[in-house]
UniProtKB/Swiss-Prot annotation:
Involved in mRNA degradation. Hydrolyzes single-stranded polyribonucleotides processively in the 3' to 5' direction. The gene is rnb. This is Exoribonuclease 2. InterPro entries: CSD (IPR011129), NA-bd_OB-fold (IPR012340), RNase_B_OB_dom (IPR013223), RNase_II (IPR011804), RNase_II/R (IPR001900), RNase_II/R_CS (IPR022966), RNase_II/RNase_R (IPR004476), RNR_Ribonuclease (IPR050180). Keywords: Cytoplasm, Exonuclease, Hydrolase, Nuclease, RNA-binding.
């Protein structure tokens, strides 16, 4: 009787038009219900029954029922799903086949298209898969998915890293191209330096060796030659291989695992500066005076070289840092020893010159996670920066400064690493903060490289960790640009990296630009969006690195929750909810909520974790601050999220 009744349809439409509507994003919880969050900051409750129609992250239109605090959102129209593609675990129980999303906030029953053929295609219970959402519950009958690919077998102990890489849409294996590896720039003249005794210093297991060094002392100081492997001699511009390298942007490094930017035929073989192998390189010879200052114009040129010595950081550091070595320790030949001692002298002078005239970072240790065959941490090495690291770092920094100036002068374009110092809107805060420590400054001076560098040198003399942390939080973000700009944090006018072209796409581009100057060509242009492309790729890689480390640390430390082990930790962040600390012995990060800063959690409201001041304040007294090194203990491990919850070894005292 009422079916297809136009009056009834019109009435229904009118009623719906009269109901208030809101557009926003769905935020799920682990308790079944959720919220609709609008762009204007309003939140509307979504009951569990309605949450079955939507997914976490969906952008929807919703009817708003009720008023005030009791108003609820009823999902009505999907604008865009936040889960078009996601990672899930396959569950096969006899004839019942389903998936459980890796993200615990993705609730709902997901049907699988073609599920009955999965087992015959080699899929097993527990396998990890990438799935595509074919239809949405708001647009039809439930959620229908389709498997795109298998990511990892259920039995793979290293599945977590493949899952992490897939979650961030990163490549999980080396690119493969059927390509004849021939020199594509025969017009570039290459000097024959195969008899010059270049050497490499890398990790013991490094395969993609891209820099070699040679040094001579002269009456004015030193002549340093930096030879960099030249993959641009093999990778054609605008080719499919070049496009893939641009998409990846960097080689991805995870514990015991890497995914190269270039095919391994290049990265680990033809372009790796292996001992005794003839390789195409781009070289830079730099003259440095006895004060450690770069003098004159650096010389860039193509060359064929052979690495005469493959060295590692540990052996070189042990040799340079010890006057006497036991018979079983590595010792260089007479020729190599002279080079190492000469480069050691240069690097010390160069570091001192930069300390006096530029800006120098405080050295931080490296943490190396050693894994067993189960994919778990077997050992964590805390490795301080040693003399061999200084040799390489000072050489590379000098070479990159030279490249920045060279490209700025000859091309007015390139891939420049830039940094504008303190954020412009925070300069007033910087001036006020510095005045508290007796340092006079002004906004205009701080906005220049010279002024910023001078302030950095003054603050370094104070050796005040609290001030260093506060200033760091007032800095702008580093950026990558295609036109020359200063790098305040290094204290230089230009900085363009070209020393890692095997593993960084920006460095590969700079190789092409430097060579275009040598060949007097003007056919290479750097896109305006190159900085956005490289920054976005690096952000994803850092998220993947963080996620893998969180998983490994949580597995490694979960059995220490009940122990009374005390860790030395430095406070590096203070937010309203608590503090974040870095464990000095293993590099792990603990979060300590306010409730675990004191003995009685009910006293947490009396603790002011002041983010603006970087201090923990109780009754107007500073109890803790950024840069403090304190004793902490592990309180809880959230394995699912990889979060480590800590507590103070000695709780803060709360007065009555």
């Amino acid at each position: 009787m009422f079916q297809n009744n136009p009056l009834l349809s019109q009435l229904k439409k009118q009623i719906q038009e009269d109901i208030p509507k809101r557009q926003g994003k769905v935020k799920a919880t682990d308790r079944g219900y959720g919220f609709l969050e609008t762009d204007k900051g309003k939140r509307f409750f979504i009951p569990p029954s309605e949450m079955k129609k939507v997914l976490h992250g969906d952008q929807i239109n919703a009817f708003i029922r009720g008023k005030g605090d009791k108003s609820t959102a009823e999902p009505n129209q999907l604008k865009k799903t936040g889960s078009a593609v996601f990672i899930a675990r396959l569950v096969i129980k006899q004839k019942n086949i389903s998936i459980i999303p890796k993200n615990p906030l993705l609730k709902g029953f997901f049907k699988i298209k073609g599920s009955q053929s999965l087992q015959s295609r080699g899929y097993q219970d527990g396998d990890w898969v990438k799935v595509e959402l074919v239809s949405h519950a708001l647009e039809g009958n439930g959620f229908l998915t389709q498997i795109i690919e298998k990511i990892a077998d259920a039995s793979d102990p290293f599945a977590y890293r493949l899952l992490t890489v897939a979650t961030h849409n990163l490549a999980n294996k080396a690119p493969e191209f059927d390509h004849p590896w021939k020199i594509i720039d025969p017009q570039l003249s290459r000097s024959d330096l195969t008899k010059t005794p270049f050497f490499t210093i890398d990790g013991v297991n490094t395969q993609d060796m891209d820099d070699a060094l040679y040094i001579e002392a002269d009456e004015n100081g030193w002549k340093l030659t930096v030879a960099i492997s030249d993959p641009s001699a093999y990778v054609p511009e605008n080719s499919d291989m070049d496009a893939e390298a641009k998409r990846r942007a960097f080689t991805l490094y995870l514990p015991n695992f890497n995914v190269p930017m270039l095919p391994r035929d290049l990265s680990d073989s033809l372009c790796s500066l292996k001992e005794g192998e003839k390789r195409a390189t781009l070289c830079c010879t730099i003259h440095i005076n006895k004060k450690g200052e770069i003098e004159g114009e650096p010389a860039f040129y193509g060359a064929w070289i052979k690495s005469h010595y493959r060295l590692n950081y540990t052996d070189v550091s042990n040799y340079l840092e010890n006057e006497e070595l036991s018979n079983d320790c590595w010792k260089p030949s007479t020729q190599l020893a002279e080079q190492l001692r000469t480069l050691d002298s240069l690097s010390l002078k160069r570091l001192q010159w930069r300390t006096d005239n530029n800006a120098v970072f405080k050295n931080q240790p490296d943490y190396t996670l050693k894994l067993n065959n189960k994919g778990e941490i077997s050992e964590i090495l805390c490795e301080p920066r040693r003399s061999a690291n200084r040799l390489v770092e000072e050489s590379m920094i000098a070479a990159n400064i030279c490249a920045g100036d060279f490209l700025a002068k000859h091309k007015q374009q390139g891939v420049f690493n830039t940094h504008s110092g303190f954020s412009s809107e925070r300069l007033g805060k910087v001036v006020s903060l510095l005045s508290e420590f007796g340092i006079e400054s002004d906004i205009q001076t701080l906005a220049t490289v010279t002024g910023y560098t001078k302030i950095r040198q003054q603050t370094n003399l104070l050796h005040n960790s609290y001030l260093d942390h506060r200033l760091r939080k007032l800095l702008s973000y580093a950026d990558i640009k295609n036109t020359p700009e200063a790098h305040f944090t290094l204290g230089v006018d230009h900085y363009a990296t070209w020393t890692s072209p095997i593993r960084k796409y920006g460095d590969l581009l700079n190789h092409r630009l430097i060579k275009s100057v040598l060949l007097k060509e003007d056919n290479i242009q750097i896109d305006n969006e190159i900085g956005q492309v490289l920054n976005a790729a690096r952000k994803l890689q850092r998220l993947a690195e963080r996620d893998v480390n969180n998983i490994l640390y949580s597995q490694y430390l979960k059995n220490q929750v009940e122990s009374k082990w005390r860790y030395k930790a430095e406070i590096f962040d203070i937010i309203k909810a608590g503090i974040r600390v870095k464990i000095q012995e293993n590099g792990a990060t603990f979060f300590i909520p306010c409730s675990l800063l004191c003995k009685d959690s009910s006293d947490a409201t009396k603790i002011d974790c002041n983010q603006a001041l970087g201090k923990v304040i109780i009754a107007q007294q500073t109890e803790l601050q950024l840069g403090d090194v304190i004793d902490v203990m592990l309180n809880n491990v959230k394995v699912e999220s990889g979060q480590l919850i800590g507590k103070l070894a000695e709780s803060l005292t709360i007065s009555e």
